[in-house]
């Protein structure tokens, strides 16, 4: 499928291309900010500027619910929603520029990897994990403060209240436990350091379950957006709309359950394994403190007691 066909399928209609001066300004500013925020990840400011300045960037009409900016790897282009003020383009471009830095292609120019996400012939693994990690990196570059939010009955604090908030909450938990630096370094350099560290800490089975669950949350959210857009195109409420609304509620319930199950798995798999490796009182105290402060990353809902029960056992 051509890029034009894919854009049309996704409801993206190009209005205009950004001029070279604007693209170069965005490339320069973003390369400076990335290198300043992540000085230890082997990034070179001039190399980044050259790489990012070669991107094409467009203003486009986009359907409701779609991200305000989208990167298309097939033509190395970023598409911005027409409603974004020119002064805000840079903040929205950061996430998409990180995607461009991440991409790994084979000799036939097929995408095989993007950060923490692997593109195989039959399935994509780690899409939700990667999107959340990139968004957390972008939030760090921009300097977004954490705020309290509530989604699908889940209360938590996040530095990404508007984009992938539930996925970001779970990935922030992983960053706290495994290490933010190893997470972000693997994300932007597209390597397995974070994955290997997680497998070493929680087991391969638990890592795959966590990764797949975050993907599932992302896919359910995307399905909700598509259904809402279909409902918006129907003039009169009828049985078909009622079935769509029921499907949305079922998806929301499934997202909540998946989030809680995944959070519980993160807690039990990490802390059970860590507890078994304790050899002295100093290790025990470090374990206790780390478990206690996990509460700062917790998503809570009515009737949720797993973390408190785990802590006092």
Residue ranges and their predicted role:
Residues 1-2, 134, 312-313:
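Non-Sec secretion/translocation targeting segments of pathogen effectors
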Residues 8, 154-312:
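Pan-zinc metallopeptidase signature
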Residues 10-87, 107-110:
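Auxiliary, metal-adjacent structural segments of Zn-dependent hydrolase domains
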Residues 19, 23-26, 90, 126, ...:
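Hydrophobic (often cysteine-bearing) scaffold residues that line and stabilize catalytic clefts
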Residues 71-72, 102-112, 142-150, 180-186:
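Short, solvent-exposed secondary-structure capping/transition elements
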Residues 91-107, 131, 135, 139:
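Active-site recognition of the HExxH zinc-binding catalytic motif
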Residues 97, 104-123:
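Nucleic-acid nuclease catalytic cores
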Residues 116-169, 173-175:
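Post-HExxH zinc-binding segment in Zn-dependent metallohydrolases
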